[in-house]
From Swiss-Prot:
It comes from the Eukaryota. This is Lateral signaling target protein 2. The gene is lst-2. A zinc finger (FYVE-type) spans 557-617. It comes from Caenorhabditis briggsae. Negative regulator of epidermal growth factor receptor (EGFR) signaling.
Length: 651
Protein backbone atom coordinates (compact mmCIF):
# COMPACT_ATOMS: atom_id res chain seq x y z
CA UNK A 1 0.00 0.00 0.00
CA UNK A 2 2.87 2.34 0.79
CA UNK A 3 4.43 1.67 -2.62
CA UNK A 4 1.18 2.50 -4.43
CA UNK A 5 0.91 5.72 -2.42
CA UNK A 6 4.44 6.64 -3.48
CA UNK A 7 3.57 6.05 -7.11
CA UNK A 8 0.31 7.98 -7.22
CA UNK A 9 0.76 10.64 -4.52
CA UNK A 10 4.44 11.36 -4.92
CA UNK A 11 5.05 15.15 -5.08
CA UNK A 12 6.39 16.70 -8.21
CA UNK A 13 10.19 17.17 -8.36
CA UNK A 14 9.85 20.86 -9.22
CA UNK A 15 7.41 21.64 -6.43
CA UNK A 16 8.65 24.55 -4.28
CA UNK A 17 6.81 23.60 -1.08
CA UNK A 18 9.09 22.53 1.83
CA UNK A 19 7.41 19.14 2.33
CA UNK A 20 7.80 18.26 -1.35
CA UNK A 21 11.45 19.24 -1.30
CA UNK A 22 11.94 17.32 1.93
CA UNK A 23 10.65 14.14 0.28
CA UNK A 24 13.34 14.13 -2.39
CA UNK A 25 16.09 15.35 -0.04
CA UNK A 26 15.31 12.57 2.43
CA UNK A 27 15.23 9.99 -0.37
CA UNK A 28 18.67 11.11 -1.57
CA UNK A 29 19.97 10.88 2.00
CA UNK A 30 18.67 7.32 2.37
CA UNK A 31 20.29 6.29 -0.92
CA UNK A 32 23.68 7.64 0.17
CA UNK A 33 23.40 6.00 3.59
CA UNK A 34 22.50 2.61 2.08
CA UNK A 35 25.39 2.87 -0.39
CA UNK A 36 27.76 3.74 2.44
CA UNK A 37 26.67 0.68 4.42
CA UNK A 38 26.93 -1.70 1.47
CA UNK A 39 30.75 -1.96 1.23
CA UNK A 40 33.82 -2.06 3.42
CA UNK A 41 35.39 1.38 3.75
CA UNK A 42 38.82 -0.04 4.54
CA UNK A 43 39.15 -1.51 1.04
CA UNK A 44 38.24 1.72 -0.75
CA UNK A 45 38.98 4.67 1.57
CA UNK A 46 38.73 7.29 -1.18
CA UNK A 47 35.21 6.26 -2.10
CA UNK A 48 34.32 6.09 1.58
CA UNK A 49 35.51 9.67 2.14
CA UNK A 50 33.58 10.87 -0.90
CA UNK A 51 30.40 9.19 0.32
CA UNK A 52 30.84 10.62 3.82
CA UNK A 53 31.17 14.09 2.31
CA UNK A 54 28.02 13.56 0.26
CA UNK A 55 26.25 12.22 3.34
CA UNK A 56 27.06 15.34 5.36
CA UNK A 57 25.89 17.58 2.51
CA UNK A 58 22.62 15.64 2.27
CA UNK A 59 22.12 15.84 6.04
CA UNK A 60 22.73 19.56 5.97
CA UNK A 61 20.16 19.98 3.19
CA UNK A 62 17.51 18.03 5.12
CA UNK A 63 18.09 20.11 8.24
CA UNK A 64 17.86 23.34 6.28
CA UNK A 65 14.47 22.30 4.91
CA UNK A 66 13.28 21.45 8.43
CA UNK A 67 14.44 24.90 9.54
CA UNK A 68 12.40 26.44 6.72
CA UNK A 69 9.35 24.57 7.98
CA UNK A 70 9.90 25.92 11.49
CA UNK A 71 10.26 29.47 10.20
CA UNK A 72 7.15 29.05 8.05
CA UNK A 73 5.04 27.67 10.91
CA UNK A 74 6.50 29.85 13.69
CA UNK A 75 7.68 33.18 12.22
CA UNK A 76 8.38 34.73 15.63
CA UNK A 77 11.72 33.85 17.19
CA UNK A 78 10.27 33.59 20.69
CA UNK A 79 8.11 30.68 19.55
CA UNK A 80 11.17 28.67 18.54
CA UNK A 81 14.12 27.46 20.61
CA UNK A 82 16.39 30.24 21.84
CA UNK A 83 19.83 30.34 20.23
CA UNK A 84 21.21 33.52 21.74
CA UNK A 85 24.13 31.48 23.06
CA UNK A 86 25.67 31.61 19.60
CA UNK A 87 27.02 35.06 20.41
CA UNK A 88 29.54 33.33 22.69
CA UNK A 89 30.83 31.09 19.90
CA UNK A 90 33.91 31.98 17.81
CA UNK A 91 33.29 33.26 14.31
CA UNK A 92 34.88 30.25 12.64
CA UNK A 93 32.25 27.96 14.21
CA UNK A 94 29.20 29.77 12.84
CA UNK A 95 28.80 28.74 9.20
CA UNK A 96 26.12 27.27 6.96
CA UNK A 97 27.24 23.65 7.36
CA UNK A 98 27.09 23.69 11.17
CA UNK A 99 23.72 21.82 11.38
CA UNK A 100 25.03 19.00 9.21
CA UNK A 101 28.16 18.67 11.33
CA UNK A 102 26.04 18.55 14.48
CA UNK A 103 23.86 15.77 13.06
CA UNK A 104 26.92 13.81 11.99
CA UNK A 105 28.48 14.29 15.43
CA UNK A 106 25.28 13.17 17.15
CA UNK A 107 25.19 9.95 15.13
CA UNK A 108 28.86 9.26 15.87
CA UNK A 109 28.31 9.79 19.60
CA UNK A 110 25.20 7.60 19.54
CA UNK A 111 27.21 4.83 17.89
CA UNK A 112 29.78 4.91 20.72
CA UNK A 113 32.50 7.17 19.30
CA UNK A 114 34.24 9.84 21.35
CA UNK A 115 35.43 13.35 20.60
CA UNK A 116 39.22 13.40 20.35
CA UNK A 117 40.81 14.47 23.66
CA UNK A 118 37.33 15.03 25.13
CA UNK A 119 36.29 11.60 26.38
CA UNK A 120 34.67 12.91 29.56
CA UNK A 121 32.56 15.47 27.68
CA UNK A 122 31.59 12.79 25.16
CA UNK A 123 30.20 10.56 27.90
CA UNK A 124 28.19 13.46 29.31
CA UNK A 125 26.48 14.47 26.06
CA UNK A 126 26.03 10.95 24.64
CA UNK A 127 22.51 10.48 26.15
CA UNK A 128 21.40 13.78 24.62
CA UNK A 129 22.87 12.76 21.25
CA UNK A 130 20.88 9.52 21.30
CA UNK A 131 17.70 11.43 22.11
CA UNK A 132 18.34 13.88 19.25
CA UNK A 133 18.88 11.14 16.66
CA UNK A 134 15.81 9.25 17.87
CA UNK A 135 13.59 12.33 17.66
CA UNK A 136 14.99 13.17 14.23
CA UNK A 137 14.14 9.71 12.89
CA UNK A 138 10.57 10.05 14.18
CA UNK A 139 10.24 13.49 12.61
CA UNK A 140 11.57 12.30 9.25
CA UNK A 141 8.97 9.52 9.09
CA UNK A 142 6.16 11.91 9.94
CA UNK A 143 7.25 14.47 7.36
CA UNK A 144 7.69 11.88 4.62
CA UNK A 145 4.23 10.42 5.20
CA UNK A 146 2.68 13.87 5.22
CA UNK A 147 4.43 14.79 1.96
CA UNK A 148 2.72 11.80 0.32
CA UNK A 149 -0.68 12.82 1.66
CA UNK A 150 -0.74 16.62 1.34
CA UNK A 151 2.49 18.62 0.97
CA UNK A 152 0.71 21.88 1.75
CA UNK A 153 -0.65 20.97 5.21
CA UNK A 154 0.91 20.35 8.63
CA UNK A 155 -1.04 18.39 11.23
CA UNK A 156 -0.71 19.11 14.99
CA UNK A 157 1.48 16.03 15.52
CA UNK A 158 4.08 17.34 13.07
CA UNK A 159 4.04 20.78 14.68
CA UNK A 160 4.57 19.30 18.13
CA UNK A 161 7.45 17.11 16.98
CA UNK A 162 9.06 19.99 15.12
CA UNK A 163 9.15 22.09 18.29
CA UNK A 164 10.46 19.19 20.34
CA UNK A 165 13.25 18.50 17.87
CA UNK A 166 14.14 22.19 17.69
CA UNK A 167 14.55 22.37 21.46
CA UNK A 168 16.65 19.20 21.67
CA UNK A 169 18.83 20.20 18.73
CA UNK A 170 19.52 23.66 20.21
CA UNK A 171 20.53 22.13 23.54
CA UNK A 172 22.79 19.61 21.81
CA UNK A 173 24.37 22.38 19.73
CA UNK A 174 25.40 24.33 22.82
CA UNK A 175 26.82 21.32 24.67
CA UNK A 176 28.61 19.89 21.62
CA UNK A 177 30.26 23.19 20.63
CA UNK A 178 31.19 23.89 24.26
CA UNK A 179 32.99 20.56 24.37
CA UNK A 180 34.83 21.23 21.12
CA UNK A 181 35.97 24.85 21.52
CA UNK A 182 36.29 27.27 24.46
CA UNK A 183 33.12 29.32 24.98
CA UNK A 184 33.06 32.68 26.72
CA UNK A 185 31.65 32.88 30.21
CA UNK A 186 29.08 35.45 31.30
CA UNK A 187 31.77 37.65 32.87
CA UNK A 188 33.95 37.54 29.75
CA UNK A 189 30.95 38.36 27.56
CA UNK A 190 30.05 41.34 29.76
CA UNK A 191 33.65 42.55 29.58
CA UNK A 192 33.51 42.34 25.79
CA UNK A 193 30.30 44.39 25.81
CA UNK A 194 32.05 46.99 28.01
CA UNK A 195 34.77 47.25 25.37
CA UNK A 196 32.07 47.69 22.71
CA UNK A 197 30.53 50.53 24.75
CA UNK A 198 33.95 52.16 25.11
CA UNK A 199 34.66 51.93 21.38
CA UNK A 200 31.20 53.32 20.62
CA UNK A 201 31.84 56.35 22.84
CA UNK A 202 35.26 56.74 21.24
CA UNK A 203 33.71 56.74 17.77
CA UNK A 204 31.21 59.44 18.75
CA UNK A 205 33.92 61.59 20.32
CA UNK A 206 36.19 61.13 17.31
CA UNK A 207 33.39 62.35 15.03
CA UNK A 208 32.91 65.42 17.21
CA UNK A 209 36.64 66.23 17.09
CA UNK A 210 36.81 65.62 13.30
CA UNK A 211 39.44 62.94 13.77
CA UNK A 212 37.23 60.52 11.81
CA UNK A 213 34.73 61.56 9.15
CA UNK A 214 31.39 59.97 8.42
CA UNK A 215 32.48 59.16 4.86
CA UNK A 216 35.30 56.97 6.17
CA UNK A 217 32.80 55.07 8.32
CA UNK A 218 30.33 54.64 5.46
CA UNK A 219 33.03 53.30 3.14
CA UNK A 220 34.51 51.08 5.90
CA UNK A 221 37.94 52.61 5.50
CA UNK A 222 40.71 50.50 7.10
CA UNK A 223 42.06 53.57 8.87
CA UNK A 224 38.89 53.66 10.98
CA UNK A 225 39.45 50.06 12.11
CA UNK A 226 43.01 50.98 13.11
CA UNK A 227 42.22 54.31 14.77
CA UNK A 228 39.33 53.18 17.00
CA UNK A 229 41.38 50.76 19.19
CA UNK A 230 44.21 53.31 19.46
CA UNK A 231 41.92 56.13 20.52
CA UNK A 232 40.09 53.70 22.79
CA UNK A 233 43.29 53.16 24.78
CA UNK A 234 43.92 56.91 25.13
CA UNK A 235 40.40 57.98 26.04
CA UNK A 236 39.70 54.82 27.98
CA UNK A 237 42.55 55.73 30.35
CA UNK A 238 41.83 59.47 30.51
CA UNK A 239 38.19 60.27 29.70
CA UNK A 240 36.35 57.02 30.48
CA UNK A 241 38.61 55.86 33.28
CA UNK A 242 35.78 54.04 35.09
CA UNK A 243 34.90 51.89 32.10
CA UNK A 244 36.52 48.95 30.36
CA UNK A 245 40.09 50.26 30.91
CA UNK A 246 39.89 50.97 34.62
CA UNK A 247 43.44 50.06 35.69
CA UNK A 248 42.77 50.96 39.32
CA UNK A 249 41.03 47.61 39.76
CA UNK A 250 42.85 44.23 39.71
CA UNK A 251 43.89 42.82 36.35
CA UNK A 252 41.35 39.99 36.65
CA UNK A 253 38.50 42.49 36.25
CA UNK A 254 39.75 43.73 32.88
CA UNK A 255 38.72 42.27 29.56
CA UNK A 256 40.65 39.29 28.28
CA UNK A 257 42.04 41.44 25.46
CA UNK A 258 43.67 44.06 27.72
CA UNK A 259 44.62 41.76 30.60
CA UNK A 260 48.14 40.90 29.27
CA UNK A 261 48.93 44.63 28.95
CA UNK A 262 47.89 45.65 32.46
CA UNK A 263 51.29 46.90 33.67
CA UNK A 264 51.96 48.69 30.39
CA UNK A 265 48.57 50.41 30.52
CA UNK A 266 49.42 51.76 33.98
CA UNK A 267 52.64 53.28 32.61
CA UNK A 268 50.82 54.73 29.61
CA UNK A 269 48.22 56.31 31.89
CA UNK A 270 50.94 57.96 34.00
CA UNK A 271 52.49 59.46 30.89
CA UNK A 272 49.13 60.57 29.47
CA UNK A 273 48.34 62.50 32.64
CA UNK A 274 51.36 64.79 32.22
CA UNK A 275 50.48 65.79 28.65
CA UNK A 276 49.36 69.30 27.87
CA UNK A 277 46.19 69.81 25.76
CA UNK A 278 48.35 70.65 22.75
CA UNK A 279 50.41 67.49 23.14
CA UNK A 280 47.29 65.38 23.65
CA UNK A 281 45.74 66.77 20.46
CA UNK A 282 48.97 66.07 18.59
CA UNK A 283 49.03 62.50 19.90
CA UNK A 284 45.41 61.89 18.85
CA UNK A 285 46.11 63.22 15.37
CA UNK A 286 49.19 61.05 14.95
CA UNK A 287 47.33 57.95 16.18
CA UNK A 288 44.51 58.51 13.68
CA UNK A 289 46.44 59.64 10.62
CA UNK A 290 49.93 58.28 11.29
CA UNK A 291 51.54 61.47 10.01
CA UNK A 292 55.23 61.75 10.75
CA UNK A 293 55.26 65.53 10.49
CA UNK A 294 52.69 67.19 12.74
CA UNK A 295 52.54 71.00 12.88
CA UNK A 296 53.89 72.25 16.18
CA UNK A 297 52.76 75.36 18.00
CA UNK A 298 55.31 77.97 18.94
CA UNK A 299 54.26 77.74 22.58
CA UNK A 300 55.40 74.13 22.75
CA UNK A 301 58.95 74.83 21.55
CA UNK A 302 61.72 74.50 24.09
CA UNK A 303 64.02 77.40 24.87
CA UNK A 304 67.71 77.14 25.72
CA UNK A 305 67.02 77.56 29.43
CA UNK A 306 64.46 74.74 29.35
CA UNK A 307 66.94 72.51 27.56
CA UNK A 308 69.64 73.23 30.14
CA UNK A 309 67.15 72.52 32.94
CA UNK A 310 66.21 69.18 31.38
CA UNK A 311 69.88 68.33 30.90
CA UNK A 312 70.61 69.16 34.54
CA UNK A 313 67.73 66.91 35.64
CA UNK A 314 69.00 64.09 33.46
CA UNK A 315 72.53 64.43 34.88
CA UNK A 316 71.05 64.46 38.37
CA UNK A 317 69.20 61.24 37.69
CA UNK A 318 72.36 59.65 36.29
CA UNK A 319 74.37 60.67 39.35
CA UNK A 320 71.67 59.29 41.64
CA UNK A 321 71.86 56.01 39.81
CA UNK A 322 75.70 56.00 39.84
CA UNK A 323 75.90 56.61 43.59
CA UNK A 324 73.21 54.01 44.26
CA UNK A 325 75.19 51.46 42.30
CA UNK A 326 78.23 52.11 44.51
CA UNK A 327 76.49 50.31 47.38
CA UNK A 328 75.00 47.50 45.26
CA UNK A 329 76.60 44.08 44.77
CA UNK A 330 78.47 43.41 41.57
CA UNK A 331 75.80 41.04 40.25
CA UNK A 332 73.03 43.60 40.71
CA UNK A 333 75.16 46.27 39.07
CA UNK A 334 75.86 44.11 36.05
CA UNK A 335 72.19 43.21 35.65
CA UNK A 336 71.18 46.86 35.91
CA UNK A 337 73.77 47.80 33.30
CA UNK A 338 72.44 45.17 30.95
CA UNK A 339 68.86 46.42 31.44
CA UNK A 340 69.92 49.98 30.75
CA UNK A 341 71.79 48.92 27.62
CA UNK A 342 68.77 46.98 26.40
CA UNK A 343 66.41 49.88 27.02
CA UNK A 344 68.81 52.32 25.37
CA UNK A 345 69.20 50.15 22.29
CA UNK A 346 65.43 49.71 22.08
CA UNK A 347 64.81 53.44 22.35
CA UNK A 348 67.46 54.09 19.68
CA UNK A 349 65.93 51.62 17.25
CA UNK A 350 62.45 53.03 17.80
CA UNK A 351 63.60 56.61 17.39
CA UNK A 352 65.34 55.77 14.11
CA UNK A 353 62.23 54.09 12.74
CA UNK A 354 60.19 57.33 12.83
CA UNK A 355 56.46 57.58 13.57
CA UNK A 356 55.55 54.21 12.21
CA UNK A 357 53.51 51.47 13.73
CA UNK A 358 55.63 48.94 15.62
CA UNK A 359 55.63 45.29 14.86
CA UNK A 360 53.36 43.09 16.87
CA UNK A 361 55.82 41.82 19.48
CA UNK A 362 55.28 40.73 23.01
CA UNK A 363 54.43 42.94 25.95
CA UNK A 364 58.03 42.72 27.19
CA UNK A 365 59.25 44.59 24.13
CA UNK A 366 56.78 47.39 24.79
CA UNK A 367 57.61 47.47 28.49
CA UNK A 368 61.30 47.80 27.65
CA UNK A 369 60.64 51.10 25.90
CA UNK A 370 59.58 52.78 29.15
CA UNK A 371 61.89 50.68 31.33
CA UNK A 372 64.52 53.35 31.75
CA UNK A 373 62.05 56.03 32.75
CA UNK A 374 60.35 53.58 35.06
CA UNK A 375 63.59 52.72 36.88
CA UNK A 376 64.30 56.38 37.42
CA UNK A 377 60.74 56.81 38.64
CA UNK A 378 61.25 54.09 41.25
CA UNK A 379 64.43 55.84 42.44
CA UNK A 380 62.54 59.09 42.89
CA UNK A 381 59.76 57.36 44.82
CA UNK A 382 62.29 55.80 47.19
CA UNK A 383 64.14 59.10 47.52
CA UNK A 384 60.97 61.08 48.26
CA UNK A 385 59.61 58.57 50.76
CA UNK A 386 62.92 58.30 52.57
CA UNK A 387 63.74 62.01 52.69
CA UNK A 388 60.57 62.66 54.70
CA UNK A 389 61.77 60.26 57.42
CA UNK A 390 65.40 61.37 57.31
CA UNK A 391 66.98 61.64 60.77
CA UNK A 392 68.96 64.68 61.89
CA UNK A 393 72.18 62.77 62.59
CA UNK A 394 74.16 61.11 59.76
CA UNK A 395 77.36 59.22 59.42
CA UNK A 396 79.91 61.78 58.15
CA UNK A 397 82.55 59.21 57.42
CA UNK A 398 80.30 57.28 55.06
CA UNK A 399 79.26 60.51 53.42
CA UNK A 400 82.85 61.51 52.77
CA UNK A 401 83.70 58.04 51.48
CA UNK A 402 80.86 57.99 48.99
CA UNK A 403 81.45 61.60 48.05
CA UNK A 404 85.12 60.95 47.43
CA UNK A 405 84.26 58.06 45.18
CA UNK A 406 81.93 60.37 43.32
CA UNK A 407 84.70 62.97 43.06
CA UNK A 408 87.18 60.47 41.71
CA UNK A 409 84.73 59.27 39.10
CA UNK A 410 84.00 62.84 38.10
CA UNK A 411 87.74 63.55 37.84
CA UNK A 412 88.28 60.61 35.53
CA UNK A 413 85.39 61.66 33.33
CA UNK A 414 86.67 65.25 33.22
CA UNK A 415 90.08 64.03 32.09
CA UNK A 416 88.48 62.25 29.17
CA UNK A 417 86.05 65.02 28.24
CA UNK A 418 87.86 68.36 28.12
CA UNK A 419 84.88 70.20 26.65
CA UNK A 420 82.85 70.29 29.90
CA UNK A 421 82.62 73.56 31.82
CA UNK A 422 83.85 74.19 35.34
CA UNK A 423 80.41 75.30 36.53
CA UNK A 424 78.86 72.06 35.37
CA UNK A 425 81.51 70.08 37.28
CA UNK A 426 80.77 71.96 40.49
CA UNK A 427 77.05 71.36 40.03
CA UNK A 428 77.54 67.66 39.51
CA UNK A 429 79.78 67.38 42.57
CA UNK A 430 77.22 69.16 44.73
CA UNK A 431 74.51 66.83 43.43
CA UNK A 432 76.71 63.84 44.21
CA UNK A 433 77.30 65.01 47.79
CA UNK A 434 73.59 65.63 48.33
CA UNK A 435 72.60 62.28 46.85
CA UNK A 436 75.20 60.45 48.91
CA UNK A 437 73.89 61.96 52.12
CA UNK A 438 70.33 60.94 51.26
CA UNK A 439 71.32 57.39 50.35
CA UNK A 440 73.31 56.95 53.56
CA UNK A 441 70.33 58.21 55.54
CA UNK A 442 68.08 55.73 53.72
CA UNK A 443 70.40 52.83 54.46
CA UNK A 444 70.77 53.85 58.11
CA UNK A 445 67.01 54.20 58.50
CA UNK A 446 66.18 50.82 56.97
CA UNK A 447 68.94 48.81 58.63
CA UNK A 448 66.59 48.32 61.57
CA UNK A 449 64.01 46.66 59.33
CA UNK A 450 66.61 44.71 57.27
CA UNK A 451 64.84 45.54 53.99
CA UNK A 452 63.95 48.44 51.72
CA UNK A 453 60.31 48.77 50.71
CA UNK A 454 59.93 49.38 46.97
CA UNK A 455 56.46 49.99 45.49
CA UNK A 456 55.09 47.12 43.42
CA UNK A 457 54.64 47.43 39.70
CA UNK A 458 50.86 47.13 39.74
CA UNK A 459 50.27 49.47 42.72
CA UNK A 460 49.00 52.98 41.97
CA UNK A 461 51.90 55.43 42.12
CA UNK A 462 50.54 58.41 43.94
CA UNK A 463 53.97 59.93 44.62
CA UNK A 464 54.85 60.55 40.96
CA UNK A 465 56.05 64.07 40.28
CA UNK A 466 54.95 65.23 36.79
CA UNK A 467 57.92 67.60 36.48
CA UNK A 468 60.44 64.87 37.20
CA UNK A 469 58.62 62.45 34.90
CA UNK A 470 58.57 64.96 32.05
CA UNK A 471 62.24 65.84 32.55
CA UNK A 472 63.26 62.32 31.58
CA UNK A 473 62.29 62.97 27.96
CA UNK A 474 64.44 65.06 25.67
CA UNK A 475 61.56 67.10 24.29
CA UNK A 476 57.83 67.19 23.82
CA UNK A 477 58.17 65.33 20.52
CA UNK A 478 60.08 62.56 22.26
CA UNK A 479 57.27 62.13 24.79
CA UNK A 480 54.58 62.05 22.09
CA UNK A 481 56.63 59.65 20.01
CA UNK A 482 57.17 57.29 22.96
CA UNK A 483 53.43 57.27 23.72
CA UNK A 484 52.57 56.72 20.07
CA UNK A 485 54.84 53.69 19.83
CA UNK A 486 53.47 52.15 23.03
CA UNK A 487 49.79 52.76 22.24
CA UNK A 488 50.09 51.68 18.60
CA UNK A 489 51.97 48.57 19.69
CA UNK A 490 49.22 47.54 22.10
CA UNK A 491 46.49 48.25 19.53
CA UNK A 492 48.29 46.31 16.80
CA UNK A 493 48.78 43.34 19.11
CA UNK A 494 45.03 43.41 19.81
CA UNK A 495 44.38 43.28 16.06
CA UNK A 496 46.75 40.31 15.73
CA UNK A 497 46.20 38.21 18.85
CA UNK A 498 42.51 38.98 19.43
CA UNK A 499 41.31 39.53 15.88
CA UNK A 500 38.04 37.66 16.43
CA UNK A 501 37.07 39.73 19.48
CA UNK A 502 38.07 43.01 17.83
CA UNK A 503 36.09 42.06 14.72
CA UNK A 504 33.00 41.35 16.82
CA UNK A 505 33.28 44.64 18.69
CA UNK A 506 33.78 46.66 15.51
CA UNK A 507 30.87 44.84 13.89
CA UNK A 508 28.61 45.83 16.78
CA UNK A 509 29.42 49.53 16.54
CA UNK A 510 29.86 49.90 12.76
CA UNK A 511 27.22 47.59 11.30
CA UNK A 512 23.89 49.42 10.95
CA UNK A 513 20.96 47.82 12.67
CA UNK A 514 18.35 46.21 10.46
CA UNK A 515 15.29 48.42 10.02
CA UNK A 516 12.06 46.42 9.89
CA UNK A 517 9.19 48.37 8.30
CA UNK A 518 6.05 48.68 10.39
CA UNK A 519 2.76 48.98 8.52
CA UNK A 520 -0.12 50.75 10.20
CA UNK A 521 -3.66 49.82 9.18
CA UNK A 522 -6.02 52.79 9.27
CA UNK A 523 -9.62 52.18 10.39
CA UNK A 524 -8.96 48.48 10.84
CA UNK A 525 -11.62 46.31 12.40
CA UNK A 526 -10.75 43.71 15.00
CA UNK A 527 -11.61 40.17 13.94
CA UNK A 528 -14.39 38.52 15.91
CA UNK A 529 -12.99 35.00 15.75
CA UNK A 530 -9.70 33.27 15.18
CA UNK A 531 -10.55 32.32 11.59
CA UNK A 532 -10.91 35.92 10.45
CA UNK A 533 -7.69 36.85 12.24
CA UNK A 534 -5.83 34.04 10.51
CA UNK A 535 -7.16 35.09 7.12
CA UNK A 536 -6.10 38.66 7.77
CA UNK A 537 -2.61 37.44 8.62
CA UNK A 538 -2.41 35.41 5.41
CA UNK A 539 -3.61 38.36 3.35
CA UNK A 540 -0.98 40.55 4.97
CA UNK A 541 1.72 38.00 4.19
CA UNK A 542 0.67 37.87 0.53
CA UNK A 543 1.80 41.49 0.06
CA UNK A 544 5.28 40.84 1.46
CA UNK A 545 8.11 39.62 -0.79
CA UNK A 546 8.71 35.89 -0.62
CA UNK A 547 12.12 34.52 0.35
CA UNK A 548 14.36 33.14 -2.36
CA UNK A 549 14.01 29.49 -1.34
CA UNK A 550 10.25 29.53 -2.07
CA UNK A 551 10.71 30.12 -5.82
CA UNK A 552 8.29 32.27 -7.83
CA UNK A 553 4.51 32.45 -7.82
CA UNK A 554 2.84 30.47 -10.59
CA UNK A 555 -0.05 31.83 -12.60
CA UNK A 556 -3.15 29.73 -11.80
CA UNK A 557 -4.28 27.40 -14.56
CA UNK A 558 -7.81 28.80 -14.64
CA UNK A 559 -6.51 32.34 -15.25
CA UNK A 560 -4.83 31.47 -18.55
CA UNK A 561 -6.65 29.86 -21.50
CA UNK A 562 -3.94 30.34 -24.14
CA UNK A 563 -0.16 30.30 -24.43
CA UNK A 564 1.53 33.47 -23.23
CA UNK A 565 3.99 33.47 -26.15
CA UNK A 566 2.16 32.17 -29.24
CA UNK A 567 -1.44 32.79 -28.02
CA UNK A 568 -2.55 29.32 -29.11
CA UNK A 569 -5.54 28.07 -27.06
CA UNK A 570 -5.06 25.10 -24.78
CA UNK A 571 -7.02 21.91 -25.41
CA UNK A 572 -6.79 18.21 -24.67
CA UNK A 573 -3.67 17.84 -26.83
CA UNK A 574 -1.98 21.21 -26.20
CA UNK A 575 -1.28 21.10 -22.46
CA UNK A 576 -0.29 23.87 -20.02
CA UNK A 577 3.32 24.15 -18.80
CA UNK A 578 4.61 26.59 -16.18
CA UNK A 579 7.95 28.32 -16.57
CA UNK A 580 9.96 27.81 -13.36
CA UNK A 581 11.74 31.13 -13.82
CA UNK A 582 8.87 33.56 -14.44
CA UNK A 583 5.84 31.45 -13.38
CA UNK A 584 3.79 32.10 -16.54
CA UNK A 585 1.99 29.43 -18.60
CA UNK A 586 3.21 28.29 -22.03
CA UNK A 587 2.60 25.46 -24.43
CA UNK A 588 5.08 22.67 -25.00
CA UNK A 589 6.52 24.30 -28.11
CA UNK A 590 7.26 27.59 -26.32
CA UNK A 591 8.74 25.93 -23.19
CA UNK A 592 10.82 23.04 -24.48
CA UNK A 593 14.11 24.20 -22.88
CA UNK A 594 15.43 23.29 -19.44
CA UNK A 595 18.10 24.88 -17.24
CA UNK A 596 19.04 24.85 -13.55
CA UNK A 597 18.02 27.82 -11.37
CA UNK A 598 19.90 27.57 -8.03
CA UNK A 599 18.66 30.92 -6.74
CA UNK A 600 15.08 29.60 -6.89
CA UNK A 601 15.94 26.27 -5.29
CA UNK A 602 16.17 24.23 -8.52
CA UNK A 603 19.56 22.54 -8.53
CA UNK A 604 18.63 20.20 -11.36
CA UNK A 605 17.41 21.26 -14.81
CA UNK A 606 13.77 22.34 -14.95
CA UNK A 607 11.43 23.59 -17.68
CA UNK A 608 11.64 27.27 -18.67
CA UNK A 609 10.13 29.28 -21.49
CA UNK A 610 12.14 30.28 -24.54
CA UNK A 611 12.45 33.91 -23.50
CA UNK A 612 13.79 33.06 -20.03
CA UNK A 613 16.14 30.50 -21.56
CA UNK A 614 17.61 33.07 -23.95
CA UNK A 615 17.82 35.63 -21.17
CA UNK A 616 19.68 33.21 -18.89
CA UNK A 617 22.17 32.31 -21.60
CA UNK A 618 22.67 35.83 -22.97
CA UNK A 619 21.17 38.47 -20.70
CA UNK A 620 22.71 41.35 -22.69
CA UNK A 621 21.42 40.22 -26.06
CA UNK A 622 17.91 39.47 -24.89
CA UNK A 623 16.77 43.08 -25.07
CA UNK A 624 18.11 43.49 -28.59
CA UNK A 625 16.37 40.30 -29.67
CA UNK A 626 13.06 41.36 -28.15
CA UNK A 627 13.32 44.77 -29.82
CA UNK A 628 14.09 43.11 -33.15
CA UNK A 629 11.12 40.79 -32.78
CA UNK A 630 8.88 43.76 -31.98
CA UNK A 631 10.17 45.59 -35.06
CA UNK A 632 9.57 42.53 -37.25
CA UNK A 633 6.08 42.20 -35.82
CA UNK A 634 5.40 45.88 -36.54
CA UNK A 635 6.69 45.53 -40.12
CA UNK A 636 4.59 42.43 -40.74
CA UNK A 637 1.49 44.15 -39.35
CA UNK A 638 2.08 47.17 -41.60
CA UNK A 639 2.50 44.86 -44.58
CA UNK A 640 -0.74 43.07 -43.76
CA UNK A 641 -2.60 46.37 -43.46
CA UNK A 642 -1.26 47.60 -46.81
CA UNK A 643 -2.19 44.34 -48.54
CA UNK A 644 -5.68 44.50 -47.05
CA UNK A 645 -6.11 48.06 -48.29
CA UNK A 646 -4.93 47.05 -51.79
CA UNK A 647 -7.39 44.16 -51.87
CA UNK A 648 -10.28 46.39 -50.85
CA UNK A 649 -9.34 48.97 -53.46
CA UNK A 650 -9.19 46.41 -56.25
CA UNK A 651 -12.55 45.02 -55.28
Amino acid sequence: MQSFRKIWNKPRPDDWMPLARFYYADSALNDIASELDSFDGRRDPDRCNALVTRLRVAQDRVLHIITEMLIHLYPREQDRACRDFRIKFPDEILHDTLPGQLWFGAECLSAGSNIIDHETESDLIRPLAKEVTKQLDILRDLLKNQSLRDPSAYNPVIKENLLKFDKLFAEFEYQYVSAMVPVKSVKEHDSQLDVAVLFSEVLSLALEKDLITQDLIDYCDPSVMIAIPRLGIVWGLLVYSEGALNVDVPAENLSEMFRPFYSLLVKIRNLLRILTPVELTRLETVLCKGETAVPEDSSSKLTMSDFRTNATDEEKAKNNQRVWMCDMPSDSTSSLDSDLRDSASEATSLASSGLTSPSSGSEDNLNRMVDKSDEELDDDVIETASSEENESDSNNENVEMVASSGDSSETESNSKENEEDVDEQATLQALAHETAEQLVAIKKKHEKHSKIIIPMQNEPRTLIDPKNLRSRFRSSEDLVHRLFVCIAGVADQLQTNYSSEIRKVLKIILQPSEVIPVYEVVNAQVANNSTEGEETGVEAQETLPLPAFMGVRWVPDEDCEQCTACSMPFNFVRRRHHCRNCGRIFCHKCSCNSISIPEHGYDRKVRVCNLCYVHRLNPFGCNEQSQASENNTGISSVAEQSSAQATSASS
